[in-house]
Amino acid sequence: MIPGEVVCAEGVIELNEGSPRTELEVVNTGDRPVQVGSHVHFPQSNHALQFDRSAAHGLRLDIPAGTAVRFEPGIAQTISLVPLRGTREVHGLSLTPPGKLDAS
């Protein structure tokens, strides 16, 4: 074993296995590229991104942890979203009010 080495199981590892996926078209209406990280509650992403924010409620990008998607100005892009998991609470960013995504 090498310090920091990650040993994965044999075979294919499916990202977000079993999660329902939602596809949305996104257009960056701004004049600069926008990057959105893997665990951002997608409706709270940069307001220059034009997409159906209500359809994206409770969802994040379907990409590996620690990565991001870059949206270039004026280019339409279809993305895949999956539900946020765990406690489904979002603090900070622009959720008004911050906290639970689902009604209790």
UniProtKB/Swiss-Prot annotation:
**Reaction catalyzed:** urea + 2 H2O + H(+) = hydrogencarbonate + 2 NH4(+)
Could you list the residue ranges forming a coiled coil in this record?
A: none
What biological process terms from GO does the record include?
urea catabolic process
Q: Provide the alphabetized UniProt keywords.
A: Cytoplasm, Hydrolase
The family note in this entry says:
Belongs to the urease beta subunit family.
- Which top-rank group of organisms is this from? Bacteria
The keyword Hydrolase appears for this protein = yes
One GO MF term: urease activity
Cited InterPro entries = Urease_beta-like, Urease_betasu_sf, Urease_subunit
Q: What is this protein called?
A: Urease subunit beta
- Transmembrane region(s): none
Q: What top-tier enzyme class does this entry carry?
A: hydrolase
Tell me how this protein assembles: Heterotrimer of UreA (gamma), UreB (beta) and UreC (alpha) subunits. Three heterotrimers associate to form the active enzyme.
What is the E.C. number? 3.5.1.5
Q: Which Pfam families match?
A: Urease_beta
Q: List the disulfide bonds.
A: none
Its subcellular locations are: Cytoplasm
The keyword Cytoplasm is assigned to this record: yes
UniProt lists the gene as ureB
Name the principal localization, coarsely classed.
Answer: cytoplasm
Natural source organism? Rhodococcus jostii (strain RHA1)
